């Protein structure tokens, strides 16, 4: 059996992040399940969610656009941070951490905070 080599490029994390936002906007639940870890930790303002099931209980599709974001990798952990825009206004700063599992990037932590604070 030939194993696929681990993906180690910042470009792959960027593609994963864009796929996540597209799936979020289009209600592509199977894609969201593929990209978000079952044990994801999510912090949005004062709301803390633990696990993918908790996320899906509050999920509503919306369109967000990444603006000015960076990607870093250290071994099997990568992270992206920057701003998310909605209707051309900065809505949140975002930090999204990813960890490779079975040679795929999975979202394991999301932190969104109000850009006006």
Protein language model features and the residues they cover:
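Hydrophobic/anchoring residues in structured secondary elements
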Residues: 42, 71, 110-112
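Hydrophobic pocket/interface hotspot
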Residues: 20, 32, 40, 55, ...
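Short beta-strand segments enriched in hydrophobic/aromatic residues
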Residues: 36, 84-86, 111
